[in-house]
Amino acid sequence: SGTAAANYYPAICEANISHVPLVVLTTDRPHELRQVGAPQAMDQLQMYQNHVKLFVEMALPEATEEMLNYAYWQGAKGAAFAQQTPAAPVHLNFPLREPLLPDLERKTKSSQQTALFAGQSILSTEQVQQLADQWYQKNGVLVVGGSHTEEEAALFIQLAEALQWPLLADPLANIVTHGQNSEVVIAHSDLFLNVATLPQEPEVVLRFGSLPISKNIMLWLKRLATTETAFYFVDENGQWQEQLKKSQTVIQAKETTFVEQLLTVVKPTEATWLAQWLLLEKTVSEVLLETLNATELNETTASLAVHQTMKENGQLFVSNSMAIRYLDRFMDSRPYRMFGNRGINGIDGIVSTALGMSAVAPTQQNVLLIGDLALYHDMNGLFLAKRYQLPLTIVLLNNNGGGIFSFLSQRTLREDDFEPLFGTPLDLDFSLVAELYGASYQEVKTIAELKQILQTAAEEPQFQVIEVKGNRQENVHLYESILAEIGRRVERQGISWNG
């Protein structure tokens, strides 16, 4: 209740945008103690506003059959509402009078059960065929955002293969991680889109869900939206969350069912279309292999080491800001599951959410890749690992501040202005943080040392913090040098480079 309930706010906002079905229960003062100056009382009616899809002010409890039925029905209704498309949080607020404890010896009837039958949005066979006909022999691109399971990722890959279209995806879609046997998955498009001029432009863009994290994909699509390219947007949640606002066709259907329908009717386009993408992907992959293998331990190579040491079916939670971008730019295909909070893209609650991931599968390999600011923001979340003995390996990328702003226009400010406003150095000793919460701690100096610790942790899970100290300016220099080398090689292939 009170400010404790207010502390749920960031999680509820994230769950709303990420379409996580969450039931939030808060306690409250009874009505006669509200707005009269009673202690520990605040207005909790609609306290989460439009970030929840349902709010219920529960009745005061009574030990009657009618009230038990009421409580059951509101609980069932709340759980059902949370799961209905679009999935989102619901809030039930419970006012309580003293005595606050019920009669625990009192016998009550067994809880009733309510079965819920719900349909899903499905296109007709004629509608699916009409779309397939519109795409026949067209050069297209699949763009997939959002978070997906391995099975869902496999369906998107099958569709791209059936069409012979390149597939661009957000890292959390788990398409890159599970696309190791498919050439249609373009893992490194962020490093060439919007700067390399493709010999052919797509005639069709088929989008599923939110835009991927890549800014270059977004800018490229934004430019295409001013051309003759036809945009199709699959809107599973029926909310028209289309950032570009340029789609000529909106398809309201359950994504996986729609893809399964398409697989029965679509035909492949000419092989030359995919070939130009494969050439660019091959060029970028070669540059990354040569450059990063010759680079000492830093934030980028540490992120790749985490990626490369993930076991099949392992679980990696990736923080926002730079951690997710390192993987989006540089990772290749590996069969593990990646998680993150990409609804609002904030750094609140990253540690707690990662520990929730670990709690679901504590015997699996569980790793968190996080920066120092994000760890500091949710430091108290580490207590969950100690309290519930959750074996999470935390790889801390510590560049003493907010690294993302060193890649943005703010970096041109004077250091005296940049550091307190955007760099925001913490100067914290994280070995003491680890000690406080009962985690083992190691600072690593080499890639080999980091990989060895991660491989051991994969076989013998434990709660530990592995710190990699980095330098913000070095990260920017490495990124820019990689782009420059990619540009040189691409231009030698006769492709214009505007980087």
Give, region by region, the residue ranges found by the protein language model:
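Structural signature of the thiamine diphosphate
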Residues: 17-19, 53-109, 197-226, 230, ...
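Conserved thiamine diphosphate
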Residues: 1-65, 70-72, 76-93, 98, ...
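Glycine-rich, acidic loop regions that bind phosphate or pyrophosphate groups
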Residues: 26-73, 170-280, 467
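Glycine-rich, anion-gripping cofactor-binding loops and their flanking helix/strand elements
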Residues: 145-232, 240, 333-363, 377-379, ...
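Structural motif
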Residues: 140, 204, 315, 365-367
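Glycine-rich phosphate/diphosphate-binding loops that line cofactor/substrate pockets in enzymes
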Residues: 79-86, 127-141, 159, 199, ...
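Thiamine diphosphate
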Residues: 25, 32-45, 329-499
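Active-site diphosphate/adenylate-binding microenvironment
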Residues: 278-363
